[in-house]
Amino acid sequence: MASQGTKRSYEQMETGGERQNTTEIRASVGRMIGGIGRFYIQMCTELKLSDYEGRLIQNSITIERMVLSAFDERRNKYLEEHPSAGKDPKKTGGPIYRRIDGKWIRELILYDKEEIRRIWRQANNGEDATAGLTHMMIWHSNLNDATYQRTRALVRTGMDPRMCSLMQGSTLPRRSGAAGAAVKGVGTMVMELIRMIKRGINDRNFWRGENGRRTRIAYERMCNILKGKFQTAAQRAMMDQVRESRNPGNAEIEDLIFLARSALILRGSVAHKSCLPACVYGLAVASGHDFEREGYSLVGIDPFRLLQNSQVFSLIRPNENPAHKSQLVWMACHSAAFEDLRVSSFIRGKKVVPRGQLSTRGVQIASNENMETMDSSTLELRSRYWAIRTRSGGNTNQQRASAGQISVQPTFSVQRNLPFERATVMAAFTGNTEGRTSDMRTEIIRIMESARPEDVSFQGRGVFELSDEKATSPIVPSFDMSNEGSYFFGDNAEEYDN
């Protein structure tokens, strides 16, 4: 991408830093990770969790959610102004699972948000450490991406369920900053914009007055984020049209849906980061690892290394398959929900199966589920190889637009050939090329029709042995190309509902 010169790297976004060199970036990301780890250890002490209980992923998620809730300024303010029955705006909590007499017991805990904020700041050298909070949000988002399908949300905004591979980060909160914006898929941004436009259509005052001015600024900012994800001039020009519209309405919604469809072939650039549960960082810090001194990267070997020697447990329901639960969490850890299953399987060294074939529900346990029958097992989060995370859409030719992989948003920078029936996607583009954006639409369709799926994406990029930390000798896998491995096809997973 030619225009990337002014952009900050992810790690800079992640840590709010200005331009830094690699060492400084690794140190500041390390500082962020170390802070999460120290916070987790302190929380385990406060809650008197045993070593085993501290490694339970469900406990980790509760602790992460508590600190995210404690720092959610807007919601805290809202809760104080609209007191609801039985909700103390100053407290936060959740289920903590303890092992008592060979059984798992659920205990609901409640803490002062002020106290949680104090513990978090103390673990982060007295700072608010927003980067660490965003990091945990992205981990939760990646877990949701691997666990739930967003068919209903897609249909509600007038999009097509086949666009599910564009929905990365669709459950990230608005407050997730630049690092959050980087990991949002094209479909997620389109959906946020459509919701906004629909509100404007239904509510005459949405764009008016002082509030309306702020709304407008947010709208244009979101348009620019989405524009930055597209890699062809025609798609970007169309985004300019949407952004500059005086009074956004149905024409803009049409344009956005058109752009989302086009992203199935002309993939947008979406960042991928390996964000791990807080307990993993806690374990490493507790065993004496100094993240800031050693440095850390979210897109290199470091997360793989960490998972190689961390033991994390999970509660398992009576009819769930522990191996499937492990796959779900592994995919979440590497932000691989939208990656080609063949690539994931090769890196993991175990077959990664489509979601419809998993015998496992989500990781979190609902408050009405029976604990009597709960068991726990070790999550197998190790991998055979490691690979660099990408933020390109995997289009084969950056100079002139070409095809990325349909139904897949690549996570790993690993060579793969592109099995791909362009006809099936092109069928979605019959019909409307009228209106203000007709020339751009025609141009985008022309690019897609001429986009040859060249032989391979990420040519020459391979995976690395876990001993090869400097990534010196890539192993380029060869895949059986009879079918494209999308995780979502033939799917019957449950929906994500807030």
Curated annotation (Swiss-Prot):
The keyword RNA-binding applies. Residues 1-23 are annotated as: Disordered. GO terms for cellular component: helical viral capsid; host cell; host cell nucleus; ribonucleoprotein complex; viral nucleocapsid. Keywords: Capsid protein, Helical capsid protein, Host nucleus, Host-virus interaction, Ribonucleoprotein, RNA-binding, Viral nucleoprotein, Viral penetration into host nucleus, Virion, Virus entry into host cell. Disulfide bonds: none annotated. A motif (Bipartite nuclear localization signal) lies at residues 198-216. InterPro entries: Flu_NP (IPR002141). A motif (Unconventional nuclear localization signal) lies at residues 1-18. GO terms for molecular function: RNA binding; structural molecule activity. Late in virus-infected cells, may be cleaved from a 56-kDa protein to a 53-kDa protein by a cellular caspase. This cleavage might be a marker for the onset of apoptosis in infected cells or have a specific function in virus host interaction. One of its GO terms (biological process) is symbiont entry into host cell. Belongs to the influenza viruses nucleoprotein family. Homomultimerizes to form the nucleocapsid. May bind host exportin-1/XPO1. Binds to viral genomic RNA. Protein-RNA contacts are mediated by a combination of electrostatic interactions between positively charged residues and the phosphate backbone and planar interactions between aromatic side chains and bases. This is Nucleoprotein. It comes from Influenza A virus (strain A/Swine/41/1949 H1N1).
